[in-house]
Amino acid sequence: MMLALATVAANAKDVLDAPTWTDNLTTTAEAKDLTRAAAMAVDNEGNSIVTGSFTKDLEFAASYLEPVANSAFIAKYDKAGAKKWAAGLAGAATVTTVATDADGNVYAAGVFADQVAIKDASGETKATITGMADKVDKVSGFIVKYDKQGAYVASKTILAESDAEIAALDMIGVLSPSFTAKKLVVDGNKLYLSASYKGNVALDGVTLQGKYACSEGWLYNDETTMCVLSFDAADLANASIVSVLGATEQLTNEATYNTEDVNFAINDGKIYVAYVASGKDMTLTAAGKDTKIETAYEASATEHAYVLAAIDGDQVTTQVYHSVATDNSNTLNTIDEMAYQKGKLYLAGSFNQALPFDNTISYLGGCDAYVACLDAASLNKNWAVASAFDEGDAKHKAEIISGMLVDEDEVTLVGWVENTSDRTIEAPLGYQINTKTPAIQKGEQVLITSVAENGNYALYQTDNVNGSDEDKTTEGTYSYIFYSNAESSGISKVLADDNTIDWDGNEVTLAKSADITVYTAAGAVVKSAKNVKSLSLADAAHGIYLVKVGKQALKIVK
């Protein structure tokens, strides 16, 4: 059963506008094997590209894929919701990001282990990629390109290795080289990829140098460095370094300096990169130029600074937003979302220190969600807001951001409260930010695990993982809901009326008796009752529904 959703009421419309299409896609024999928050994209024509994991035979339109272990799929729906094709990576692989270009080509990147067969839409193996030797974890990187029909075009593996000189030192430590793709963006004839890595990475004659830390003179470990790379979009060749942030020295003896997150946005050839980093002696490299970055760092307290760079050809503008050093051992400082719109940059994520964009803003519980708006030309702050939501146990709960939608007057933020001990979702989160004020308010509390948009097209995803033993006995299903006009998606600020609708995952309950009607996302009536205070949906299929009570409406996910 899907996680119970929080109470929410609406009176914005008599009935929220129906989506263009919805679909449920079952891909795993056990729900626990689903890749949560699976990457998605929407192309310029409104076609939806979805990804995820599959452990059972996958039939999608004319495509048929057979899994090897927990495999990864990439599938395409057209604007009307018709299934077009599915391709895949048969083997231990996970797609972490996906993008499209102006011609409808599809690019996916992620992590894998051992040997993985790359399948096209016909199910034929077009290439086999091999990961780092003797590594069972998914620590090797890949990029794959398909055309708009699902035909294989090109692929690339990205492998890290421990530095030979460091590994030969007379010290004790376990080195764990890795490369993890984070975000893909196509701009013109270039494909851009942000990533984190440990160890040395060699690509097309370009080398990313691994960084290491030594403590007590004998114990050493990898440090995390993050970067943005570019490739020729046509064939994934000619790798080039756009930006890197990591420790200045290859081997530091005082402390561990890590880059903790990276995100980026592109507009008209100008690249905006944002990092989270901690360490006294860090170096930002952009357009071949080095800038020293220093954050407050002591043995018992660390600052997690937000470092931004605007790269326009060989011109680089930088800005560092500092916080206050804290002794938080559980660091939750992220840039989960980043977007450019009309001369402004919007960043969203979580933080558990004084907010670097405004040190007067603190957090509650384990962390808070934030949205910051910057002037793209100067990288100066326009405004910043935070959720001020106390999710409870500071050591075991966190606010996770899964999507951000930006328009001229409003920013919508969605996500969930997660138990960090077992990664279970405890409650959905939704926030609306009025960009004119600016002010943040709670929005519709509907579980959305992934979001993709392109212009007025918007695609939302959820799944049926609930973190209980049911995940071992229930098939894993992704649910999608697509709007061809995002302004009528219903993912907007909602207000309380004179009744309250509750949903516990099985039953709809009201504060007072009224007529209840339940619709599918496409508008068909599923169930109705008159003058009642509750209505059971225990026998309804998993999916997205709309509950209407008078002038109120509530989207639920079962």
Indicate where each model-derived feature is located.
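Sec-dependent, cleavable N-terminal signal peptides
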Residues: 1-13
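Generic secretory/membrane-interface signal
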Residues: 5-8, 374, 500, 514
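A sequence-level/structural motif corresponding to short, flexible coil/turn segments enriched
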Residues: 12-489
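C-terminal outer-membrane/trafficking sorting elements
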Residues: 492-558
